[in-house]
């Protein structure tokens, strides 16, 4: 096992193959296969054009599969430094490269899915399991709806996005940061990905560059939407750790 979090990550040693098995995400989403299928399709394209990504496995078909009821996909092992998280500036450069490559992706991806359908699923699960109250759920939904409208008005651009682009979803390699974990990929404005990246490490120079490209109002709206979007997931992760799921 490499990691057990939202998904179980397993190295099929000695083969250079990594399996990503939907565990917590399957519990919340009920059917994780569409997420995994979108991820494999997008990353297959990105690997083909040389973008900085962990590529699908070239030893076994990438899938996704369902094995004994578990949804999973297969990926190439990337030699990296597991103790190092890429710095925000290096990750920003790699994300720019990724966005340039994703503009050519010919497939269809749902608009801002992490904050739309996936938010609804996570919030419904949190409400069903009493991790949020009905009042909290209504408040979060109202805030989400208003911020979606605001971001749609301020940033109408639409292209393929990573969807969950904080620096821990990249690894440090000899070529620099390489991005992985695209199961939240979606379409929308690039400011969504950029806001996620700098929210935890708001380096002034990078924030200024994002404001120059997209405007401060769009960055603020994307940041506020991200904060609302992850709240149900934070509650779910906290419960998992406390209860040992």
For the regions a language model picked out, list residue spans one by one.
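Active-site activation/catalytic loop segments of kinase-like enzymes and analogous catalytic loops
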Residues: 190-216, 225-243
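A short, glycine/Asx- and small/polar-enriched loop/turn
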Residues: 5-6, 12-15, 66-71, 225
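Conserved short submotifs of the Hanks-type protein kinase catalytic core
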Residues: 68-80
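Protein kinase glycine-rich loop
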Residues: 1-3
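A cross-family kinase active-site recognition segment
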Residues: 82-136, 156-158
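ATP/Mg2+ or Mg2+-diphosphate-binding catalytic cores
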Residues: 23, 125-129, 135-136, 230-245
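A conserved alpha-helical element in kinase catalytic cores
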Residues: 21-68, 85-97
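Active-site acidic catalytic loop and adjacent metal/ATP-binding pocket
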Residues: 6-13, 17-20, 56, 148-194
């Amino acid at each position: 096992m490499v990691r057990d979090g939202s998904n179980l990550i397993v190295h099929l040693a000695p083969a250079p193959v990594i399996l990503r098995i939907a565990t917590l995400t399957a519990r919340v989403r009920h059917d994780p296969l569409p997420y995994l299928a979108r991820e494999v399709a997008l990353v297959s394209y990105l690997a083909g054009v040389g973008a900085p990504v962990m590529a699908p496995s070239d030893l076994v078909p990438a899938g996704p599969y369902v094995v004994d009821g578990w949804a999973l996909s297969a990926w190439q092992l990337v030699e990296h430094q597991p103790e190092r998280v890429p710095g925000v500036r290096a990750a920003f450069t790699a994300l720019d490269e990724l966005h340039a490559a994703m503009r050519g992706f010919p497939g269809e991806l749902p608009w801002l899915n992490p904050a739309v359908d996936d938010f609804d699923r996570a919030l419904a699960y949190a409400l069903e399991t009493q991790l949020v109250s009905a009042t909290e759920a209504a408040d979060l939904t109202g805030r989400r709806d208003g911020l979606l409208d605001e971001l749609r008005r301020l940033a109408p651009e639409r292209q393929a996005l990573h969807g969950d682009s904080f620096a821990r979803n990249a690894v440090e390699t000899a070529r620099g940061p390489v991005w992985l974990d695209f199961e939240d990929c979606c379409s929308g404005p690039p400011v969504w990905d950029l806001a996620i990246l700098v929210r935890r490490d708001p380096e002034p120079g990078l924030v200024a560059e994002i404001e120059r490209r997209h405007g401060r109002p769009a960055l603020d709206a994307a940041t506020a939407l991200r904060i609302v979007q992850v709240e149900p997931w934070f509650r779910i992760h906290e419960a998992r750790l406390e209860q040992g799921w």
